[in-house]
Structure formats: C-alpha cells, structure tokens
Amino acid sequence: MNDIYTQAQHQLDALGLRCPEPVMMIRKTVRKMAEGETLLVIADDPATTRDIPSFCEFMDHTLIASDISKTPYHYLLKKGL
C-alpha cells in the first residue's frame, strides 16, 4: 500500500459490503470526523469505483487518492464542510 494511505486519521473496512452499504458506512463515519480529517476506505465492491467518487463530489468531500487497480480497493477521503 502506498505511504499516502498509511497517513489517514481514520479507517473504514468495507470488505464484503455491497452497494449501498459502503457509502452508507462512509457517510456515518464521516459525520463523526472533524473538517479536514482523512479517512481510508478499504472495499472490494466494484460499485465503489463509481459510488465513492460521486459521494465525495455530492457531499463536498475531497477524494485525495484511490487505488482501484486491484482488490481490495483503497480510497483516501478528506472531509469537507
């Protein structure tokens, strides 16, 4: 795993969860975070490759990095306003 992912302040294991569960879990986790904090999401649902970027855009969070070249997928999000 790239070093950028190890710097995340929070981590969410969404392995085995299927749409819409990963995004629901992300939303619940992000609500508890402070603005600017980061969240590493580890998932294996192929739908997350479109759902997580869309969620970030819709909710004004930043998708800092993603690795979807192989499973499990890794996403690094930064909480927005």
Curated annotation (Swiss-Prot):
Pfam families the record matches: TusA
UniProt GO cellular component terms: cytoplasm
GO BP: tRNA wobble position uridine thiolation
Domain of life: Bacteria
Molecular-function GO term, any one: sulfur carrier activity
Compartments in which it is found: Cytoplasm
Family: Belongs to the sulfur carrier protein TusA family.
NCBIfam families: PRK00299.1
Protein name: Sulfur carrier protein TusA
Taxonomic placement: Bacteria, Pseudomonadati, Pseudomonadota, Gammaproteobacteria, Alteromonadales
